[in-house]
């Protein structure tokens, strides 16, 4: 009997020991969990504070970069204007330098942003032809006139119609303006201000232009300033359609983030529900791209036709240069005074919405970590 009691007491002792061991382990688990929870809270708090700090530093760096870009842009444009008056014969070289440096950089940037199909647009196609003319065939009269038609036709009027903005704090906008503006200035200087061209057009002791560029024949002018450029433009349109809408169609359908000129124009027109969107839908949504091609063809034909009187009149050509530059500056002012403030307000709202949960979390953790005097503190029992 005594043995049974001893065995029972031993069993109870061992059971109590096991139970105590489980309690100790549970207590350790709870303590470990509390410790890890505190560490997680502290880590979260540190990361939240760092996120706020990084956001403020990024904003300061962005402002500094914008100021530097604005400074460089203003000085660069001022230097170009000085060079335009002091040494107009060097403007073609400046343009070639600009194209060789900035267009490849733009391709890299646009590739990263999935905008690289923009580089298949007509303005880049035409600028490539300009580069070939200036570097390889600078005395080819016919190619010069084709380039003149492109530069002072579709490219020049795009500044006005598509509202290209001269914003010195935006490298992308500066490059966009210069791609459309510089070619016209280049061929303006060659046409009227280049001393070598002056000598060719007005030989000493004669009133006739006996050499390049020979422009007396109106049929000759019409052919090389309108008909031939129109054929070259049509070739580009066919190639563009084959590449973007046939060969790369599936790629574009798989990735809606990849942008093309048609996608951008259609999105903006649909959002604004403007005349362009309404007219492009006359033949149905499935035929909108054909309507855009038609509109672009009409725009190109009209602007190329205007290059003939511009080519013949120095005064008209000067007025047109002033009009282009004024339009780019006006659009830039509109962007700075109207569009940019709205963008800043939207950006601030978005940033506040993103940072508000983080700030609330920080305040909550501080309140939990540092209770006020009126709040009861936990006591061990």
UniProtKB/Swiss-Prot annotation:
InterPro entries: GPCAT. It comes from the Eukaryota. Residues 1-63, 111-116, 163-173, 245-291, 337-381 are cytoplasmic. Pfam families: DUF2838. GO terms for molecular function: glycero-3-phosphocholine acyltransferase activity. It catalyses: sn-glycerol 3-phosphocholine + an acyl-CoA = a 1-acyl-sn-glycero-3-phosphocholine + CoA; sn-glycero-3-phosphoethanolamine + an acyl-CoA = a monoacyl-sn-glycero-3-phosphoethanolamine + CoA; sn-glycerol 3-phosphocholine + (9Z)-octadecenoyl-CoA = (9Z-octadecenoyl)-sn-glycero-3-phosphocholine + CoA. GO terms for cellular component: membrane; plastid. The chain crosses the membrane at residues 64-84, 90-110, 117-137, 142-162, 174-194, 224-244, 292-312, 316-336. It is a multi-pass membrane protein. Residues 85-89, 138-141, 195-223, 313-315 are lumenal. Its EC number is 2.3.1.-. It is found in: Membrane. The keyword Thylakoid does not apply. GO terms for biological process: phospholipid biosynthetic process. Keywords: Acyltransferase, Lipid biosynthesis, Lipid metabolism, Membrane, Phospholipid biosynthesis, Phospholipid metabolism, Transferase, Transmembrane, Transmembrane helix. Glycerophosphocholine acyltransferase (GPCAT) that utilizes acyl-CoA to acylate glycero-3-phosphocholine (GPC), forming lysophosphatidylcholine (LPC). Shows broad acyl specificities with a preference for 16:0-CoA, polyunsaturated acyl-CoA, and the hydroxylated ricinoleoyl-CoA. Also catalyzes the acylation of glycero-3-phosphoethanolamine (GPE) with acyl-CoA. In addition to acyl-CoA, GPCAT efficiently utilizes LPC and lysophosphatidylethanolamine (LPE) as acyl donors in the acylation of GPC. Belongs to the GPC1 family. This is Glycerophosphocholine acyltransferase 1.
């Amino acid at each position: 009997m005594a043995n049974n009691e001893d065995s029972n007491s031993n069993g109870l002792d061992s059971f109590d020991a096991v139970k105590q061991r489980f309690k100790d382990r549970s207590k350790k688990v709870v303590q470990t969990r509390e410790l890890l929870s505190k560490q997680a809270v502290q880590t979260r708090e540190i990361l939240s504070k760092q996120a706020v700090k990084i956001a403020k530093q990024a904003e300061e760096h962005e402002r500094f970069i914008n100021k530097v870009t604005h400074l460089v842009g203003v000085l660069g444009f001022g230097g170009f204007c000085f060079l335009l008056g002091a040494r107009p014969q060097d403007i073609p070289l400046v343009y070639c330098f600009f194209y060789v440096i900035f267009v490849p950089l733009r391709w890299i940037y646009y590739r990263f942003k999935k905008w690289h199909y923009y580089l298949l647009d007509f303005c880049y196609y035409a600028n490539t032809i300009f580069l070939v003319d200036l570097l390889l065939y600078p005395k080819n009269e016919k190619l010069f006139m084709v380039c003149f038609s492109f530069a002072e036709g579709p490219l020049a009027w795009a500044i006005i119609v598509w509202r290209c903005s001269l914003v010195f704090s935006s490298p992308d906008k500066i490059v966009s303006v210069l791609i459309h503006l510089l070619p016209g200035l280049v061929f303006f200087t060659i046409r009227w201000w280049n001393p070598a061209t002056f000598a060719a057009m007005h030989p000493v002791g004669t009133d006739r232009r006996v050499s390049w560029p020979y422009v007396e024949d109106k049929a000759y002018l019409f052919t090389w300033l309108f008909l031939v450029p129109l054929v070259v433009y049509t070739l580009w349109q066919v190639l563009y359609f084959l590449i973007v809408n046939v060969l790369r169609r599936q790629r574009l359908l798989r990735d809606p983030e990849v942008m093309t000129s048609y996608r951008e124009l259609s999105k903006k027109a649909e959002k604004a529900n403007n005349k362009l969107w309404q007219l492009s839908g006359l033949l149905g949504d499935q035929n909108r791209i054909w309507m855009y091609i038609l509109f672009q063809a009409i725009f190109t034909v009209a602007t190329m036709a205007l290059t003939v009187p511009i080519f013949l009149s120095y005064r008209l050509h000067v007025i047109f240069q002033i009009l282009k530059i004024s339009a780019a500056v006006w659009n830039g002012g509109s962007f700075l005074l109207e569009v940019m403030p709205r963008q800043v307000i939207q950006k601030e709202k978005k940033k506040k919405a993103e940072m508000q949960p983080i700030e609330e979390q920080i305040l909550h953790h501080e309140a939990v970590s540092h209770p006020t005097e009126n709040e009861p503190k936990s006591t061990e029992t």
